[in-house]
C-alpha cells in the first residue's frame, strides 16, 4: 500500500468517523511519528521486499523481544548490504518527509475540523436550547389555546343563554306592556268608581248619624224597660223560691209516705210469699213430678204393649223444656232424699232396737193444714175455719215393712206403691224447684207458680189468694182445690195432652 493510499484512507476514515474518535486516532498517530525517526536511524538488515515489509521490519526491531539477535545479524550482514541500505535509507527519508508533510496537513485539517466541530457543537447546544424553549413556548401556547377555546365555548354558551333570556325578557316585556295598558284602563274605571263610592260614603255617614241618634233613644227606652223587667223577675224569683220551699216540704212528706207505703208493700209481699210457700208445700210439687214421670212411663209402656201410636200432642208435652227441667231437678232431689231417708230409717231401726221390742209399727206422720175462712173450693162452697183435714194424699193407715213402697212415689199409679213412708215428704225448702232464684220462670209465671197479673190481683184481693189454681205448663190437669173429696179421686187423675 502506498503512502498516498494510506493518507486517502485516513482522510476517508476521518471524514467517516465521528469527531471524538478522530481526535483519539490523531493522538496515537502523532505519538508513533515522534518515536519513528530514532528507530529508523539505527542500522538494520532488510532482506529484499516491498517498502511495507522494510517498515514493518524496522518497527519490529525497535519493539520486539529479540532485538539483540537482530543487531548481531545486522553487523554480520553490514558489509554485504551497505550499498542497498543507503538507497533504502534515502527512500525512507523521502517517505518520511512526505509523511511529515501529510501529517502536518492532516493536523491542520484536523484542527480546522475540530474548530468546526466545536462551533457546530456550540450551535447544536444553542439549537437544542432554542428547541427546548420553543417546545416550552409551544406547550404554553397550547395550554393558552385550550383555555381560550374553553372560554370561547363558555362565552358561546353564555351568549346562547343571554339570547334565550333576551327573548324571554322581550316576551315578558310585551306581556307587561299589555298588562300595563289593561291596568291603566282599569285604573281609570276604578277612579270613576272611587268617586262614586266617596259620594255614597258621604251619604251613608249622614244616614248613620241620623239612625244613631234614633237608636240611642230606643236603647235608653229599652234600658228602662229592662230595669222594670229585672225588678219583676226578682219579685218572681222570690215567689218561686217560696213556692219551691213549699213544694220541697210536700215532696219530703210524699217521700215519707212513699217509704211507709213501700214498707207496707214489702210486708204484704212477705206475707204473700209465706202464703205462697205454704201453698206450694201443700201442693207437694215433687210428688206431682214423680206422678208425671210414672204416668209418662205407663203411657209409653201401654202404647208399646198395645201397639198404639202416641199422639203428637203427648210428644210435644214430653219435650217441653220446663217439664224436662222439673224432671232433672226431681231426680237430683230424689237421690238426695233417698239417701237421707235411708239414714233416717237406719237410725230409727237402731233406736227401736235399743229402746224396746221391735214389733211396734211406726206411726204415719199426717200433715194437717188450716183452711182460711175466705178460701173456696171448685164448687163454690166455703168450709168453716175450724175444719182440719189430713194431708193432700191423706191416709191414716200405718205402713208395714212389707207394703212400704218406693219413697217419693204417689198413689193412684201403682197399687203396690200407693202407700208412702212418713219420711218421703220432704221440706219445701229442699224440694221446691221454684225456691231458687236461678230457676227459670214457667210460661210467664213468677217464682211462686202464679201469673204476675194474678199475683197483683191477689195483693189487692187477699180473699182470692187461696182460690188461685196452680197448673203445670203444657198440661190439662184439673185444678187442685182444698176439697176433701179429692182423696176419692186421686186414683182416677190422668194427664192429657194439649
Swiss-Prot record:
One of its GO terms (biological process) is mRNA transport. Residues 1-82, 328-361, 394-498 are annotated as: Disordered. InterPro entries: She3 (IPR031398). Residues 1-10 have a biased composition (Basic and acidic residues). Residues 44-82, 328-360, 450-471 have a biased composition (Low complexity). It is a peripheral membrane protein. Residues 397-406, 425-449 have a biased composition (Polar residues). Transmembrane segments: none annotated. Residues 86-272 form a coiled coil. It holds the Pfam family SHE3. GO terms for cellular component: endoplasmic reticulum membrane. One of its GO terms (molecular function) is RNA binding. Signal peptide: none annotated. Belongs to the SHE3 family. This is SWI5-dependent HO expression protein 3. It comes from Vanderwaltozyma polyspora (strain ATCC 22028 / DSM 70294 / BCRC 21397 / CBS 2163 / NBRC 10782 / NRRL Y-8283 / UCD 57-17). The lineage of its organism: Eukaryota, Fungi, Dikarya, Ascomycota, Saccharomycotina. The gene is SHE3.
